[in-house]
Amino acid sequence: MSNNSFDDKSIDKLKAYVYALFDPLEDRPFYIGKGRGNRVFQHVEGAILEDKESNKYETIREIRSRNSNNRVKHTIVRHGMSDEVAFEVESALIDLANSTGANLTNEVTGHNSIEIGIMNADEIIQKYNAQPLNELLHSVVIININKKYKAIKDGALKNNTKYPG
């Protein structure tokens, strides 16, 4: 048995799973994903074999460069799921991690995170009680800010996107 792959019996029992990659020195996740089979181990392999630049690969390369004993820690958070359930669990964990200031290297936030992802009570009320905009009375510019941006203090988003004139 190897620490960079699962045996066939384990793969059969895992089904779809959600995993986290940890920096062993910081003991906090830097990546959360959904997979089957040996997917959890493929990121380290990709960082070694590919020239692709990404925050995830850079983090893995940095961990590996410290010394041979520093390895990415692979943690299965939940397993034995269908793909559909695993996507929901993955999205919920990414949302929670991002809302607590974790420095995840995920390039996307997960399935349906914009529509049904993490929201406070006021945001839920606003979402489901918003009145439809039937007509525009003035010229407008619409800026779509998705949840990929880092959380900022109240008012800062408005101040940074309003017209200066």
Regions found by a protein language model. Name each.
Residues S2-K150:
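Structure-specific nucleic-acid interaction/processing domains
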Residues G155-G165:
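Structured alpha/beta reader/binder surfaces that contact nucleic acids or chromatin modification marks
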